Structure formats: C-alpha cells, structure tokens
C-alpha cells in the first residue's frame, strides 16, 4: 500500500473551476493521494461561473500537506489582499514537498512571498504583474523552479499536474494517467497563445480584462507594499 500523499487545493471565491479541477483529475490518481479542498471560511464556495462547491474545509484546520496547489481566476484580485489566505499559503508552503499553481495562482504565491527570486508561469494577460513581486516571468506553459511548479492559463494546469506526477511517480505513471484521461489536445483553432491569435481575437480577449484592470492594478500595488513591509 502506498504511503499517504496529502494534497491541498487552496481555494477562494471566484476561482476558475478548471484551474483546480484539471489538476485534481490528474493528482487524485497518484498512489496514496488524499486530496483536500479548503478555503479561508470553509463550507460552500462559488466559482466564477454558476458552479458551487460544498464541503470545503477551513484552511486553518489543515496542518500541513505534501503538495499545495493554488488556482487562479478573477477572484485573485480580492484574494491577493486576503491576509488570512496568504498566511495559510505561507504556512502550508513552508512544509510542503511541492508547491504548485495554475493561471493567476502564481501571483498569489508571489504575494505570499513564496516566489521571491524565482521564475514562474502565469496567465498571459496577467504575467507582467509577476515582476512587481520580484518574480521572473516565463512564457512557458509549465515552469519548474526547484520544488515549485507553475502553470500558465487555465488548461495548463493539466500539463503542470502531469509533470508533477512524473516527478513523484515516474514517467510511466504520468503517461498512463494521460492516456486514461485521453489528454491529447487538438484544438480546432490555433489561437491558444497571444503570439498565435489573430489581432481581432487578441483585442477581444484583452477587453475582457478591462473591467477589472484598474481594480487589479491597485490591489496588486497594495499587495506589493504589504509584502515589502512584512
């Protein structure tokens, strides 16, 4: 029987559900995996769609974990100033064997002080903010820096989780899981990265961020100041 391997998904309101359900689908297949969904308040959580998740534990009830996973989403704007959430990331990250993130989750790791001087991936429309926290932005889909694995936007979380699985359980296990979930991306359009997308598509995608850009930038500036003052 495999030894227990504890995985904590540190959630917050208005996450993008695929940011954590993608890696969750992969990582639950690790031998001995025991996955916990947790948030500051625990209980029920609403994501950035109509979906809700219930039965979450409170983050302060989780003592430690082998792997910490931090998703992203528009809720990052509020979470980056949630000191209880950031404190939980610092506490769990200090003992974790692996620290991971998906999408804008790397910005939350950065705000918690866990990425200082590191390289990290992030959603393409947000990754420039990593530099504000002293983190080197990397456009790769998955970036590893020591025990830290960061994924780019949303779907990159599956790639990140498979790389982590290969590190922990070996390539054969990772490839077997990839086949089991039939992860063989073949999108109908070649527009999944900003450098590949047509200009009208890129403009439309950037426009989605406009509604929160000012709020985001102000929140991140305060988060940087708080981290510098710590």
At which residue positions do the language-model features occur?
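Short pre-catalytic strand/loop immediately N-terminal to key active-site residues, enriched for Gly-Thr
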Residues: 94-95, 143-149
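Generic recognition of short, well-ordered alpha-helical interface segments
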Residues: 121, 125, 156-159, 172
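Solvent-exposed alpha-helices and their adjacent loops that cap or buttress functional pockets
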Residues: 61-62, 141-142, 157
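Structural detector of well-ordered beta-strand residues that form the stable sheet scaffold
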Residues: 99-100, 121, 138, 149
């Amino acid at each position: 029987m495999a030894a227990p391997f504890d995985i904590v998904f540190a959630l917050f309101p208005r996450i993008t559900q695929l940011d954590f359900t993608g890696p969750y689908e992969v990582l639950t297949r690790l031998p001995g995996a025991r996955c916990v969904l947790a948030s500051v308040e625990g209980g029920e959580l609403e994501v950035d769609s109509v979906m809700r998740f219930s039965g979450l534990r409170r983050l302060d009830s989780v003592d430690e974990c082998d792997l910490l996973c931090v998703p992203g989403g528009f809720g990052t704007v509020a979470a980056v100033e949630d000191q209880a959430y950031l404190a939980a990331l610092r506490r769990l990250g200090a003992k974790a064997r692996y620290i991971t993130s998906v999408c804008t989750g790397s910005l939350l790791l950065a705000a918690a002080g866990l990425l200082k001087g590191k390289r990290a991936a992030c959603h393409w429309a947000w990754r420039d903010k990593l530099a504000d926290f002293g983190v080197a932005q990397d456009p790769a889909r998955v970036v590893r820096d020591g025990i830290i694995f960061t994924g780019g936007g949303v779907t990159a979380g599956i790639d990140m989780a498979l790389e982590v699985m290969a590190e922990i359980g070996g390539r054969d296990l990772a490839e077997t899981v990839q086949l089991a979930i039939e992860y063989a991306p073949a999108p109908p359009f070649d527009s999944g990265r900003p450098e590949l997308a047509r200009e009208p598509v890129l403009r439309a995608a950037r426009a989605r961020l406009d509604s929160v850009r000012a709020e985001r930038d102000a929140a991140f500036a305060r988060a940087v100041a708080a981290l510098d003052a710590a």
